[in-house]
């Protein structure tokens, strides 16, 4: 094992030693399903390796009575997993990419971004409102979401609705919707509902024209120790080139804006005919003030290649030496350019006011 010298262990099976890779994950059912998906891909690629899943709770899992945007910490769903990586208790961890900050702590990197599923949001309705849409819900209906991004966009579009914070994992939120008479509907990520096998609960899909999605939404990320070359090589084959380039652009946009979950920032990316289109927007908390722009860059979706030099620096926390560097840099530059355009037009004022108001709410 190269890198920091620790990582994988071995196990006896049929008298022969098998290498064991320890995979860290959050404890929620959705997190376990996502991790099982990644492990299944790795097992198919490396049948001679055994994978052991180690589940743990994160700060975001434990603090359930406060909106995420109010907790005031960036690595809400990743810090404990990174601590386990640092202590060599696990060899890699699986995250929802949207939970991973655009700047990682020293010593860590995203070694793989898997093929993105539907990045859009969905509305799940209380049984008595099945067949409705957000537009046709009764006046002052309560819609549950813990996302400032969703509230800012949807409040502007559907002023007759009231948006209320709802926390907990998907199971908890659906139970609150169905059993309490508090919510007429809740807004969740399509990808999460699909992974849980709950597609039948999707009452309305919010397309980007109605509600742009979070940076990285719908994609899974594999985080590893940056110097653990062996594990980096092992997981890098999971990189999906199109997803990678879209997410580099999105993360570069967010990082350059200095955004996070405490301000409403949203994106939409499309790769078509050798062009990467990035739409990004910022909103005031109530959605009354907003700014959106679209830019594009010429980027062909590359096939994976032989690994480039080992000393290539990360881009927005991601290492992908098997994807052409030029394409990655073009995607990063697109995100930076779009953020710069918005900042030059006054987006910083919108974001600063949103942060201040969020702090005092």
From Swiss-Prot:
Localization in the cell: Cytoplasm, Cytosol
Pfam families according to UniProt: Porphobil_deam, Porphobil_deamC
Keyword Transport included in the entry's annotation: no
Modified residues (N6-acetyllysine): 74
Metabolic or biological pathway: Porphyrin-containing compound metabolism; protoporphyrin-IX biosynthesis; coproporphyrinogen-III from 5-aminolevulinate: step 2/4
Listed InterPro entries: HemC, Porphobilin_deaminase_cofac_BS, Porphobilin_deaminase_N, Porphobilinogen_deaminase_C, Porphobilinogen_deaminase_C_sf
Record note on disruption phenotype: Mice display the typical biochemical characteristics of human acute intermittent porphyria, characterized by acute, life-threatening attacks of 'porphyric neuropathy' that include abdominal pain, motor and sensory neurological deficits.
Root EC class: transferase
Catalytic activity, as annotated: 4 porphobilinogen + H2O = hydroxymethylbilane + 4 NH4(+)
Subunit organization: Monomer.
Family recorded in the similarity comment: Belongs to the HMBS family.
Function: As part of the heme biosynthetic pathway, catalyzes the sequential polymerization of four molecules of porphobilinogen to form hydroxymethylbilane, also known as preuroporphyrinogen. Catalysis begins with the assembly of the dipyrromethane cofactor by the apoenzyme from two molecules of porphobilinogen or from preuroporphyrinogen. The covalently linked cofactor acts as a primer, around which the tetrapyrrole product is assembled. In the last step of catalysis, the product, preuroporphyrinogen, is released, leaving the cofactor bound to the holodeaminase intact.
Protein name (record): Porphobilinogen deaminase
Gene name for this UniProt entry: Hmbs
């Amino acid at each position: 094992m190269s890198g920091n010298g620790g990582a994988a262990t071995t196990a006896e099976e049929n008298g022969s030693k098998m290498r064991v890779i320890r995979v860290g994950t959050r404890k929620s059912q959705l997190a376990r399903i996502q991790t099982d998906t990644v492990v299944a891909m790795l097992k198919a690629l490396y049948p001679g390796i055994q994978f052991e899943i180690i589940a743990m709770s994160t700060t975001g899992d434990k603090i359930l009575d406060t909106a995420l945007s109010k907790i005031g910490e960036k690595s809400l769903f990743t810090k404990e997993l990174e601590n386990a990586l640092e202590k060599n208790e696990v060899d890699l961890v699986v995250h929802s990419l949207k939970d991973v900050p655009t700047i990682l702590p020293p010593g860590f990197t995203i070694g793989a971004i898997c093929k993105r599923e539907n990045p859009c949001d969905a509305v799940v309705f209380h049984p008595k409102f099945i067949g409705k849409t957000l537009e046709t819900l009764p006046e002052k209906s309560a819609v549950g979401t813990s996302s400032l991004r969703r509230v800012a966009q949807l409040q502007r579009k559907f002023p007759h609705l009231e948006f209320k914070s709802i926390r907990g994992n998907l199971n908890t939120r659906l139970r609150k919707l169905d059993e309490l008479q508090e919510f007429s509907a809740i807004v969740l990520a399509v990808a999460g509902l699909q992974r849980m096998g709950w597609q039948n609960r999707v009452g309305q899909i919010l397309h980007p024209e109605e509600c742009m999605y979070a940076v990285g939404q719908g994609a899974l990320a594999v985080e590893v120790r940056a110097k653990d070359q062996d594990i980096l090589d092992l997981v890098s084959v999971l990189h999906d080139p199109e997803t990678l380039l879209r997410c580099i652009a999105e993360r570069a946009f967010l990082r350059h804006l200095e955004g996070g979950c405490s301000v409403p920032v949203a994106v939409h990316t499309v790769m078509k005919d050798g062009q990467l289109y990035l739409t990004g927007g910022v909103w005031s908390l109530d959605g009354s003030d907003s700014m959106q722009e679209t830019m594009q860059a010429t980027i062909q979706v590359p096939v994976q290649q032989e690994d480039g030099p080992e000393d290539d620096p990360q881009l927005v926390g991601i290492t992908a030496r098997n994807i052409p560097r030029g394409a990655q840099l073009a995607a990063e530059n697109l995100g930076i350019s779009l953020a710069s355009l918005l900042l030059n037009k006054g987006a910083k004022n919108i974001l600063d006011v949103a942060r201040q108001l969020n702090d005092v709410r």
